[in-house]
């Protein structure tokens, strides 16, 4: 009997298939870019801390309700409601991207790409299950 027992393999993304390496210059650049995008009058680290504090509050509520906001709602309603809403709406996707980068440089774990290729070549359906922002 040569029938496969499994037809699909699902992977968690953050911390399993992909990890964030602490790369301070990379992370600092992302924090600076966030500050510029928002037009924040604060110092970079002060602005970043403001976003972090508000994100923690948002995240608790989102997890409690099992519902995440899209980029526009996240930045306009939860993270930067006191900033120029037109500007924030225009750059909300970039803000989300830079926020992720501020947590570290994302890389696929050693051997991860090879595992994906091998499973694909063997005919498995592949998927990702994740609770990451963005």
Q: Predicted segment positions?
A:
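Short histidine/acidic/glycine/proline-rich micro-motifs that form metal-
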Residues: 17, 61, 134
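A metal-dependent, Asp-based hydrolase signature
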Residues: 49-96
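Glycine-centered loop/turn motif at secondary-structure junctions
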Residues: 39, 83-84, 120-123
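Active-site neighborhood of HAD-like aspartate-dependent phosphohydrolases
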Residues: 2-50
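Substrate-recognition element of Asp-dependent hydrolases with the DxDx(T/V) motif
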Residues: 91-108, 112-134
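Soluble or luminal CAZymes and related metallo-dependent hydrolases
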Residues: 26, 67-71, 104-111
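Alpha-helical elements of Rossmann-like donor-binding domains used by nucleotide-donor carbohydrate transfer enzymes
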Residues: 29-33, 53, 74-77, 114
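Short, solvent-exposed loop/turn segments at secondary-structure boundaries
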Residues: 21-24, 62-63, 103-104
